[in-house]
Structures are given as structure tokens and as C-alpha cells.
Design a protein with these regions (language model features):
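Acyl-donor-binding surface of acyltransferase catalytic domains
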Residues: 1-6, 49
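Short loop segments at secondary-structure junctions
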Residues: 71-73, 123-124, 242-245
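Short, cationic low-complexity segments
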Residues: 256-257
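Short amphipathic alpha-helix that is part of the acyltransferase structural core
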Residues: 9-77, 81-84
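Long, contiguous binding/interaction regions
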Residues: 246-253
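Acyl-donor binding region in acyl/amide transferases
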Residues: 85-220, 225-233
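C-terminal "cap" of GNAT-fold acetyltransferases
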Residues: 232-245
């Protein structure tokens, strides 16, 4: 699916068919992201924040918010938030550090950006919307020239045994980062660590589209699985090194020829 660079509008990052991705510039636009997150997380993850119809936290103010819009209706159908290492240093830190103690961060902080709160309207989970979320990140990476992308990727909270099996499989097969090492903070420990099958198999249940996309792009798992009880998810810390990305996926990710 072809994603085109925009011709106009400074905050417009890319276009694909009748969808576009842009950077939120106003509090009202950020509310659109928070409303979508509330609706999707509340409906699918049974995570219901306070009753104002918004999913918001203390980190939202320091993040930049990507919005995918369906142009015919004007509806916001996808969102992702992203912050630089400098943003994190000036604010409350990295969101991922609320779940993990992460060794190695300071060595790469200046080259590191963090993403999170990926969310797509269930009626619009097409290739176009997902491609535009990737294109938005790629446009920022090209502009800001950061090397590393870090974030938490979620799978259903019932898959604790499968999460540990997945982590063990990647560790045996070179899929775990040697740059960062995340360990669960108190209250985020993932159970079932010891009750693992002996087979060296990759459990397909954990391979959500987002996680699969990161792994295909060359990302590595940067920490053991954690259990986010508030959201009812198991989370993996991922680290994507743009400097180590293959030419094929660099072209796919950035749109470069």
C-alpha cells in the first residue's frame, strides 16, 4: 500500500487514500486522541478511566500525539503518542519506566525516542491506518534523526504463560536486546514464569499485528514480560534500532526508494 508524503499543511505527515496522519497541535486535537483511546481501551481491554470520556494520564502533556484521520468523515481513527529522550528528561521520564527498571537507558538517551498508547478504531483496522501510523513515526525519525525507538507493546493479559514462552524463545534465538534490560517493577511482575512447556516453539497467540510489525522491522525485546493489572494486559518492552535495520525494511518503514 502506497503512502505518500504530504504536499501541504505543516503538521500533515503522510497520506494514504482517504486517510491522513498529522501531529496534534491543540488541546482539542489531543482530546480526540484521548477520546478514541477511552472508547477502544474501555471496550476491548475493559479499562475504564474516570467518567469524562477520556483516557488520559500524567504523561500526555509531554508527549506528541499522532492522529490518523478519515478525511471523508473527519473522524479520528488512529493515534500513537511519541516523545524524545529530552522530552522525557524535562518531564516525568519515560512511561516505560513506570512498569520497568531499565538498565542501559542513559547510554542511549540522546538517541532514543519512546512511543506508546497505540490505538486504532476497530472499524478502521485496515492496512492504510496501520501503515500511516508507521509512516508518521518514520517521518519524525527522518526529521529528528534519532536512532532508537522504545515502547511497551501489549498482548491480552490472559496470556501470561505464553508471554514467558515467547520471551524464552526470543532469548534463545537472538531476539532479546543487549542494549537495554528491563525488569518488572513491584506490582508489575508477570506470573507463570516457572510453568512453561519444554517445547522450543514460538506461541502465535502473542503475535499481535503491532508486535509482529516491530519484530519484522528488526526490533528486539528489551525486557521480561510485565503484567499491567490496571489495563489487563501483558506488556513487552521493545527496542528498534534504525541503524541496524535492513535496507528492505528501512525502505518499507521510511518510504525511501
Amino acid at each position: 500500500m502506497d503512502v505518500a508524503a504530504p504536499e501541504t499543511a505543516q503538521n500533515l505527515l503522510a497520506q494514504c487514500g482517504h486517510f491522513s496522519i498529522r501531529m496534534a497541535e491543540t488541546p482539542q486535537e489531543i482530546r480526540l486522541a484521548q477520546q478514541l483511546r477511552h472508547r477502544v481501551f474501555g471496550g476491548e481491554l475493559h479499562h475504564l478511566p474516570d467518567g469524562n470520556g477520556l483516557d488520559q494520564d500524567e504523561f500526555d502533556g509531554q508527549f506528541r500525539h499522532l492522529l490518523v484521520r478519515e478525511e471523508r468523515s473527519g473522524k479520528t481513527v488512529g493515534t500513537y503518542r511519541i516523545q524524545s529522550g529530552a522530552d522525557a528528561g524535562d518531564g516525568r521520564g519515560f512511561y516505560s519506566e513506570s512498569e520497568y527498571r531499565i538498565a542501559g537507558l542513559e547510554k542511549i538517551r540522546r538517541e532514543l525516542w519512546e512511543v506508546g498508547r497505540s490505538c486504532v478504531d476497530p472499524e478502521f483496522r485496515s492496512g492504510a491506518v496501520i501503515a500511516l501510523l508507521w509512516a508518521g513515526i518514520a517521518a519524525l525519525q527522518k526529521k529528528e534523526a534519532f536512532r532508537y525507538l522504545m515502547g511497551c507493546v501489549s498482548i491480552p493479559g490472559s496470556l501470561t504463560r505464553e508471554a514467558w514462552q515467547f520471551y524464552r524463545y526470543l532469548k534463545r534465538h537472538g531476539g532479546v536486546s543487549d542494549l537495554l534490560c528491563g525488569v518488572a517493577r513491584s506490582g508489575f511482575e508477570c506470573p507463570d514464569r516457572e510453568s512453561l512447556p519444554q517445547e522450543d516453539l514460538l506461541p502465535q497467540e502473542v503475535m499481535t499485528p503491532l508486535l509482529k510489525g516491530y519484530l519484522r522491522a528488526g526490533a528486539k525485546i528489551a525486557g521480561e514480560p510485565v503484567l499491567d493489572r490496571a489495563f489487563g494486559t501483558v506488556d513487552f518492552l521493545i527496542l528498534l534500532d534504525f541503524g541496524a535495520m535492513t535496507d528492505r525494511y528501512r525502505r518499507h518503514f521510511t518510504g525511501d526508494k
